[in-house]
Amino acid sequence: TAAFNQTIRNKKFAAAGRQEEETRMQLSGTTTLLGLIGSPVAHSKSPAMYNYCFRKFNMDCAYLAFDVAADQVEQSVKAIKTLHMRGANVTMPFKTTVVPYMDRLTPAAETIQAVNTIVNEDGVLVGHNTDGCGYTQNLRRNGIEVAGKKITLIGCGGVGSSIAVQVALEGAAELAIFNLKDKFWPSIEERMEAIHKVAPNCVLSLHDLADQDALHAAVDHCDILSNANMVGMPPMENMSNIKDPSWFRPDLIVTDVVYSPTETKLLREAKAAGCKTCGGLGMLLCQGAEAFRLYSKGLEMPIDEIQALLYD
């Protein structure tokens, strides 16, 4: 009927008005800009995640993704100051490239020489690395503390290095790192020395991942087994660094940084053996939450809401 159609039109106009009002509230002459620096970035869910949080907490901020060429990284970092941005996240392949342009680095970022979050503190650019914090925060959300624990870590690339330094800083008793003995081995040895300097009480050891006997012994000895390499994600979703599931035991905690698939072969087999497991999606969300806490000076990201909105 005409009355019914008019009611629908009125509702649409009202909704459009609310949307326009919401847009005016989000963007103004005082809106503070934040962003993502990397390449490629079109696939990133960071803008949706952070802008959701800004709306939720009525923050006059906006977050955009910037696809930056390698020769534009320095200019992009300088723009954070020039445009009075609150900060920026940094993704591949520029986590190490931005380091020389920071005014200050946190201990974790300094140790591994990699930055994934830049915070503009009144014109001083502070480089953080929240990957390691995301890992330990995800464990904490699952009732697990790393202090005093013996940890076996498989993979010591960018994410693995972040995890290694963070668990050492948070008081892990022992950390056994396994990595392929490839061209990156010398740089891993340097990282181990850097970690020892900032966390001398953590007993560190480095092993070739090809040494299955050493890996078996480490898994038998440790409290937490963490996978931090690409094994488990496509096209290796049917693979695991632990070839023999009999190595698992019910009192072992098994974690994986891979978040797609949400449950890797490693985690499936560990869970079947009675282990407590933690997947990579929680770490991904927690490292973003740590960055939001830094940007917002202490606000807590609604992690469960973000997961339901973007990943479920």
Where are these regions (language model features)?
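Phosphate/diphosphate ligand-binding glycine-rich loop within oxidoreductases
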Residues: 27-142
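Glycine-rich adenosine-cofactor-binding loop
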Residues: 38, 129, 148-169
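Conserved S-adenosyl-L-methionine
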Residues: 169-174, 273-275
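Rossmann-like adenosine-cofactor binding region
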Residues: 201-277
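Short helix-loop-beta connector
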Residues: 144-149, 250
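NAD(P)-binding Rossmann-fold cofactor-contacting core
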Residues: 172-198
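Adenosine-phosphate binding glycine-rich loop
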Residues: 252-253, 257-312
